[in-house]
Structure formats: structure tokens, C-alpha cells
């Protein structure tokens, strides 16, 4: 199978010029090097020194509250084994891990929870054993979102939405947008009796085209309620896109969409 269209440096620079992406914080900038203080990142690197550059990481500079902060990230080139997102100042630093295939260029958007102002980190692990790192500082006006009841509101439990391009040229990438109604209960919010409410999370998302893996995501406590994902698909032929959302209780929700290549 052909590799997906590579995200080139030109593409990343174009995103940055449009205000849709930002490079890693320069050495000496406030918050720079935040990743070195995250044990989970050190464990993933296993002694490899990551390189700055090659990742376009975009979040707002200021968020009025941390309940739902938009995040987009794209990695230059191909051969991305996994893309990890961390919010080091959250109670659980790991936010999400994204997995790409030859059918999906390494670009994704979602919404995350930030419990306070901090530097968000993106770590890309590549097939050749190297790693890329990027950081973005975000100021949160109202902190403590992970214990705010409004963080968990969801009126449409397990209801899904999917949007795909009408048609795609063979091998050309196009966006898939999907979401599911779910409170993403973290286990940190106190209930009426003061005891923490039980954790209840959508922990895994998978997309496949006629049975062939396209894209997957591991989701953790810091993904916003009603999880939203926008990823890319670059099919060679028409087929049925199958989407699966898996809750940590074992409950599974499925959805489908037709991908037309012509």
C-alpha cells in the first residue's frame, strides 16, 4: 500500500502563517522543557533525545476555562508510530495517544481539559526510532475544571455523529469528523455525599476501511466531554468506514460512513 500524503514543512509553515499551528517553544522561553519533568514522557523516550521541530501544535494562548480547549497537531512527513499528548499540570498528565497508518496522514484535532495554566506537550515517536517534541503554553482563566460539574454534562449518551468528504481522489487525504455523546467522568469529581463519582471514560476509538485499520486513539481523563476527533483518511478505493467507540465499562458503540473514491 502507498504511504499517505506526507505533511511537508511547507504545509506546517502554511498552518503557522494562518494561525493554525505553532512551533515548539524556543529554548529559554517560559515553560520550555516542560516535557523533561514528566516521568511518563521519559519512559516513552527510553533514553532517546527528542528533536524540536517537525510538529505543528496549536492551542489557544488564552482559554476562558479549561473545560473544552481546542487542540490540533500535525507531524511532518510519514512513519509516525504514535503521537502522545500531555498536560503536565493536570492530575493525570497523559491526555491522548493517536495511532496512524498508511491510510491516515499524521494530523488530528480534538478538545481537551486543562485544569490550570500550563505547557502542553506533543511527543511523536517515529518508525525509525527517533522522536520529535513540541510544546505550547496555554493560560487558563478559570482553573479547577476537572472538579466542575459543567465539565461532565452530556445530554446525548452514546449518540454519534460522523461527517466525511462527498468524494476523494485515489490517495488524496480528506477529513473525517466524528464525536460521541459521553460525560468522560474522570473519577475526580465529588458526588452529593462528597465521595468521588466513579470513573467512566471512552478509552478507545478505532476507524477501519473495509476491515483495514485507518486510525486509532487512546483517550484518557483529560479529553473533554462529548469526545470529538477530526482525522485524515487517504483511501485508494471506495469502501465502508467503520468507527468504534469503546467505554472502560466494556460498552461499545459503532457507526459507519461510506467513503467514495472517484
How would you name each of these model-derived features?
Residues 45-64, 154-169:
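N-terminal edge beta-strand
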Residues 180-196:
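Short amphipathic, basic-aromatic surface patches that mediate peripheral association
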Residues 24-53, 160:
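C-terminal segment of N-terminal export signals and the immediately downstream linker at the start
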Residues 137-143, 258-262:
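Short beta-strand edge segments in extracellular beta-sheet folds
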Residues 103-108, 222-230:
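Aromatic sugar-binding surface patches on proteins
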